[in-house]
């Protein structure tokens, strides 16, 4: 994993997909509290990340893209679209891809609250994201990418006895960025 600190020197314009719920909501809240400008992209606001060209046009003027929302393979398709738009930019850009530790599991393990089929589909979508992340991150570019793989995080949609509250997990991620 490439190490860098992006918050030490300037305020940023940050695009976050899925900013109304869960981890995305916490990133939006905590980064806004630090003074950053948030460009929130979510279905509840009428946006659809499956419209990748349109969504990428909202993200393009930003400094950091937190690629959080999942909608079939649109999360991966959006990563490619944004990366290609940013690859020849004169300034630094950052992409944080939100994946999951579920990718480490064997295929016969079911995610709490999902059917076995839904668990497999979710895992496969995140594996596709991680594969694309690895491929693009190996390219020479001013785009700095980070793969974030949370474990069980307590959100409106998910809770288990071992889950960490979303606010706590996001705070830890942001503190790591401040001290790298």
Protein language model features and the residues they cover:
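N-terminal amphipathic/basic-hydrophobic helices that include classical n-h-c signal peptides
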Residues: 1-11
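N-terminal Rossmann NAD(P)H-binding glycine-rich loop of SDR-like oxidoreductase domains
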Residues: 17-30
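Catalytic loop of short-chain dehydrogenase/reductase
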Residues: 70, 74, 87-139, 152-155
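Short-chain dehydrogenase/reductase
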Residues: 79-83, 129-133, 170
């Amino acid at each position: 994993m490439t190490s860098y600190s992006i918050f030490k020197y300037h305020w940023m314009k940050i695009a976050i997909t899925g900013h109304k719920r869960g981890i995305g909501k916490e990133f939006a809240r905590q980064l806004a509290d630090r003074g950053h400008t948030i460009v929130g992209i979510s279905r509840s606001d009428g946006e659809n990340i499956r419209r990748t060209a349109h969504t990428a046009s909202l993200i393009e003027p930003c400094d950091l893209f937190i690629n959080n929302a999942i909608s079939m393979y649109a999360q991966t398709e959006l990563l490619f679209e944004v990366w290609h738009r940013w690859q020849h930019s004169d300034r630094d850009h950052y992409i944080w891809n939100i994946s999951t530790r579920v990718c480490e599991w064997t295929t016969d393990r079911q995610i709490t609250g999902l059917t076995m089929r839904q668990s497999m589909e979710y895992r496969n979508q995140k594996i596709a994201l991680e594969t694309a992340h690895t491929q693009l991150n190996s390219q020479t570019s001013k785009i700095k990418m980070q793969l974030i793989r949370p474990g069980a995080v307590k959100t409106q949609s998910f809770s288990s006895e071992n889950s960490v509250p979303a606010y706590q997990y996001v705070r830890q991620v942001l503190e790591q960025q401040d001290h790298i």
